A protein has these predicted regions:
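Donor-nucleotide binding loops and adjacent catalytic segments primarily
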Residues: 4, 207-300
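A nucleotide-sugar donor-handling region in carbohydrate enzymes
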Residues: 41, 163-239, 269-273
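Short loop/helix-cap segments at secondary-structure boundaries that form the rim of catalytic
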Residues: 44-52, 128-133, 182-183, 196-203, ...
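Conserved nucleotide-sugar donor-interacting segment of glycosyltransferase catalytic cores
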Residues: 90-171
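Alpha-helix C-terminal capping/helix-to-coil transition sites in glycosyltransferase folds
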Residues: 112-114, 184, 296-297
Length: 401
């Protein structure tokens, strides 16, 4: 919307992998002349700033990574029949605690800066408090399949009636004078393809996924053409923290790939380098290289099933094999497999023989490649971040009248 300048407050969830999908829309907002500020925890002081955005630090004393790691150390927990899985309940409890820690910070920021629009990850339960404090619309920014709405277990503000919310969350909203609602957001921006979604999303705005996986100095080998077919192996940024490296069969995948005439590239965080097994000839490791830098040169990718990895590969038309350990990423992989552009194997089924069969199909199928190309076309057909920025400006302008 020409001539209307917005202040937009973005509030990502407590992980870089949830921040990255927001960055292209932030860039589009900035290049359209709008002001952008990010409210994030201390991890953002490097991740957010390196993406070119300014930020305000919130909830300094709460460590979501430690919360998830504590759950993993505790081990399996039995739940009653029909109750949400323990991991899901842990997620909800942790997000309520995060909201309680972040509430005063985001409300103070919203009152001082007066954003015209608040764009937040739907996980962030303090975001409606900020929107209410600024009298601004709240827009949810999704990152993958809408698991909060489509899981069947319910999540506050994403289809769950307020009488089902945790009592501490209702008390928090009452303290800040914010009415709890079944739907907290007026609309949802969705970079996950509608054809791969798991449920209907009210007032959905489709957004073209544009890969952003951070920045770094690249080794020249990453940009050099591959001498033979290149297969990328990656297990994302949160798997080790949340589930442990045993959730991804690194050694078995490397062994299986080595039986084919391919170049194997493992993309890992520097902190995970020590988890890489002894590698055969023809396999290399690159550390802290953004996936969007190396993915275009790859002929296939084997990964843990994260939504960001799936969509980055989809954007470049790369065939995929997802080996997924938990229900959330298993859902992502199942939706990918339904397009024909990839193969899904659940971790508990990932025997050496099953991996060998899946890898052989990935590298020899005459159907997966064309399906991956078609999926890329579907991604590129979605509205650009610039187009979505214009829609958000109309939304904000209408609410201010």
């Amino acid at each position: 919307m020409v001539g209307y300048r917005m202040r937009i407050l973005f509030i990502p969830a407590s992980a870089p992998s949830h921040y990255f999908p927001m960055v292209p829309l932030m860039w589009a907002c900035r290049t359209a002349g709008h002001d952008v500020c990010v409210a994030a925890q201390p991890w953002g002081e490097s991740v957010v700033v390196s993406s070119g955005m300014s930020m305000v630090t919130i909830a300094k004393s709460f460590d979501m990574t430690e919360e998830l790691a504590r759950h993993r150390r505790r081990g399996p927990v039995e739940t009653a029949p029909g109750a949400p899985p323990a991991l899901y309940q842990t997620l909800v409890d942790a997000q309520v605690r995060f909201a309680m820690e972040a509430a005063d910070d985001v409300v103070s920021l919203a009152r001082d800066w007066r954003p015209d629009l608040v764009v937040a990850d739907p996980l962030v339960l303090a975001a409606p408090l900020a929107a209410a404090a600024a009298d601004a619309p709240l827009v949810h920014h999704l990152w993958g399949p809408d698991l909060l709405r489509g899981s069947g277990y319910g999540y506050p503000g994403c289809g769950m009636a307020p009488d089902g919310w945790p009592e501490p969350l209702r008390e928090l909203y009452a303290r800040h004078g914010c009415e709890p609602r079944t739907e907290n957001a007026v609309t949802a921006v969705d970079p996950w393809l509608e054809s791969m979604q798991i449920c209907e999303i009210p007032s959905r705005i489709p957004l073209r996924f544009v890969p952003y996986n951070g920045t770094n100095v690249l080794p020249p080998s990453v940009l050099a053409p591959a001498k033979k077919r290149r297969v990328l192996l990656t297990w994302g940024s949160m798997l080790v923290i949340r589930d442990g490296i045993e959730a991804f069969p690194v050694a078995d995948v490397v062994k299986t790939l080595h039986e084919h005439d391919v170049e194997i590239v493992l993309a890992v965080k520097g902190a995970d380098r020590g988890l890489v097994p002894d590698l055969p000839s023809g396999a290399t490791v690159v550390e802290n290289v953004p996936l969007n830098a190396i993915m275009p040169s790859c002929d296939a990718v084997v990964h843990h099933g994260g939504a960001g990895t799936i969509m980055t590969a989809a954007y470049y038309g790369v065939p995929q094999l997802g080996v997924a350990a938990t229900r959330d990423v298993q859902t992502c992989c199942a939706r990918l497999a339904a397009t024909g552009a990839g193969i899904a194997v659940n971790r508990e089924d990932a025997t050496v023989d099953a991996l060998a069969s899946a890898v052989a199909s990935l590298l020899t199928s005459d159907r997966i490649g064309p399906a991956a190309t078609a999926l890329r076309g579907e991604v590129l057909a979605q509205p650009s971040p610039a187009e979505v920025t214009d829609r958000l400006a109309v939304l904000a302008a209408g609410s201010s009248q």
